[in-house]
Amino acid sequence: ALHGANGEDGKVQATFDLLGIPYTGTGYLSSALAMDKSITKQFFRAHNVPTPNGVTLKKGQESEPLSSFGLELPVVVKPCCGGSSVGVYIAHTNEEYWQAMKDAFSYEPEVVVEEYIEGREFSVGVVDGKAYPIIEIAPVEGFYDYKNKYKAGSTVETCPAELSEQITKELQGYAEKVAEVLGLNTYSRTD
């Protein structure tokens, strides 16, 4: 399993495929698709997997008002293809929004802006098409950003998450569907 740039985005897998080197895990195309938040949102919509309303903006479009995209504050701003929540912000004010856009565009030429949905965060692992117990991820403060992902003691993870049987089955079903739709045929994690 590879983490981070070149590993999660399919570049290492593509290189191995070209060189005929066997590896475990998902192939290059599915890895690349899964890292692109704009494309995954399109796949999710096409297959009835819930995803927040949002828009993908290219550099130069950041000055257009949120209302022109059917969005209003608060919103989540994130680089299109990044990982580990690098460059991800929850913007509650116009000032926070403009700063978030500036920072997100410093990572990539495309940014995803989504409606902010307040709630709990969960992670569902899928191996060979079967979902595993759900993990609830609760940051001690703020949201599950880069700092909270990698600083010891900054999050509380509960497994299995305290959820009704109905919600558990629903979330696991969506994670299995995501793995199927994106071709993540070995193992994956859906948040």
Which sequence ranges carry the predicted segments?
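A short, local hydrophobic-aromatic micro-motif
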Residues: T24, P52-N53, Y132, Y144, ...
